[in-house]
UniProtKB/Swiss-Prot annotation:
SUPFAM superfamilies reported for this sequence: Terpenoid synthases
Name of the protein: Trans-prenyltransferase
Upper taxonomic lineage: Viruses, Varidnaviria, Bamfordvirae, Nucleocytoviricota, Pokkesviricetes
Chain sites annotated for binding isopentenyl diphosphate: 85, 88, 122, 141
Cofactor binding, note field: Binds 2 Mg(2+) ions per subunit.
Length: 318
């Protein structure tokens, strides 16, 4: 009888050991969130621009309340992030959604952390762009710029905090995938790929900022498009095409802005050099090329009609 008990105990221990070794093992790169960023519409349900914008605003508010920014930088970072159009995070989230409609790895991926990252990077660049040593702007989004309200030193530190937190958000996105999507192929490789690509893109944006070219705008759309594609489990072989789509969209976005600022811009402005009509034609051609690629990769959805129209409206001044 005693032998049977010993044998039973050994069998149970073996089963526990096998179960443990078969369970996916991972370590967290980041501390877990104290609150969920969003509860609401299922990640794969279709959404219009307004719904996406409201969803991201909720994500942003929760992230700020959860302590994405610390101490004296909380107020200027929060101030800088309010009132945006959120077009870059919306693009990222929609590309992830569209990719997963074609193929998925178990639970749907919810890219809230990645969406925060791309917005943080973008807003950091706006803070720097407005500084006295660059454009010396005192107004943005119908309110004081960050440096004008909080001073140059806090503006510089806020831009740095936003950038650093953006990389933290990417790491948090990888951790989220590890915990919620066990069939996702090699999340650690994903994290390394995203951080390397983002670092390269931010370097390009910085170089573009120094010479005041579209290269200060396009890299942030490349981050949104390519992070969305990779997180949505799009193929690595197609990244070049997605990057081309992002370049076309970013170029159209910048040139539409040049048309809008034709009469007030004192820096380099394509519309002032080539005329509004020719510039508008390039905007339309760039959007058409972007649309063609998105169709080819089967990620063109109805919300893109709204996104493209917003760019056209900027160019038309409506």
């Amino acid at each position: 009888m005693l032998h049977l008990i010993y044998i039973s105990i050994i069998v149970v221990l073996i089963i526990i050991l096998i179960s443990y070794t078969r369970k996916p093992q991972y370590f967290r790169i980041t501390a877990p969130r104290s609150v969920a960023l969003f509860h609401g519409i299922h990640p794969l349900n279709p959404k219009n621009y307004k719904t996406f914008s409201e969803e991201f605003e909720t994500i942003l508010n929760n992230a700020i309340e959860d302590g994405d920014f610390k101490g004296q930088l909380t107020e200027p970072c929060s101030y800088a992030l309010r009132g945006g159009k959120y077009i870059r995070p919306i693009i990222l989230m929609e590309i992830v959604r569209a990719c997963q409609l074609q193929h998925s790895f178990g639970a749907p991926i919810y890219p809230a952390e990645a969406a925060l990252a791309v917005e943080y990077f973008h807003v950091a660049s706006l803070i720097i762009d407005d500084m006295p040593s660059f454009d010396n702007d005192v107004k943005r989004r119908n309110k004081d710029t960050v440096w004008a309200r909080f001073g140059v030193a806090k503006a510089q530190m806020s831009a740095l905090a936003l950038t650093m937190q953006g990389f933290q958000n990417i790491c948090r996105q990888v951790d989220w995938i590890k915990e919620n999507c066990p069939r996702f192929p090699d999340p650690n490789q994903l994290g390394a790929l995203l951080c390397t690509f983002v670092s390269h893109s931010l370097n390009s944006a910085g170089s573009g900022q120094l010479v005041d070219t579209p290269e200060k705008t396009i890299p942030f759309f490349k981050i949104a498009f390519i992070m969305g594609w990779v997180l949505g489990t799009g193929t690595i072989e197609d990244i070049g095409a997605i990057e081309r789509a992002a370049h076309c969209f970013g170029n159209a976005f910048q040139l539409a802005d040049d048309i809008k600022d034709h009469d007030t811009d004192t820096g380099r402005n394509y519309a002032k050099i080539h005329g509004k009509r020719k510039t508008f034609d390039v905007v339309a051609q760039s959007l058409q090329e972007c649309k063609k690629i998105l169709h080819e990769k089967k990620i063109y959805t109805s919300i893109w009609n709204e996104i493209f129209q917003k760019v056209i409206n900027v160019a038309l001044g409506t």
